[in-house]
Amino acid sequence: MASVDCSYSIKGSGPAVFFVHGIGARKTSWNEVCHHLEKDFTCISYDLRGHGDSPKGVLPYSLKDLVDDLETLRQKLNIQKMHIVGHSL
């Protein structure tokens, strides 16, 4: 399945950290965490497909689809190295 163009937010500077929210949440659930880390890290939070401001794409979704979406966003932002923080998947 093709990846979707996920809605995302970038704050701060430094090593890249992608924040992946849980099912039923959205990128803004990471706002408080990013606020505390943005002085030392580039914080990238994004809405999973079908959540928040991201399009739904084609149902059903698989874990591979969600990984493909993250990889597409990583490439779009030209990020070579990254850390990933997530919960509830």
Model-derived segments and spans:
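A short loop-to-beta-strand scaffold at the N-terminal edge of the catalytic core in hydrolase folds
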Residues: 1-10
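Conserved HGGG/HGGXW glycine-rich cap/lid loop of the alpha/beta-hydrolase fold
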Residues: 9-59
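Alpha-helical elements of Rossmann-like donor-binding domains used by nucleotide-donor carbohydrate transfer enzymes
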Residues: 7, 32, 36, 65-72
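Active-site loop/oxyanion-hole signature of alpha/beta-hydrolase fold enzymes
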Residues: 44, 48-89
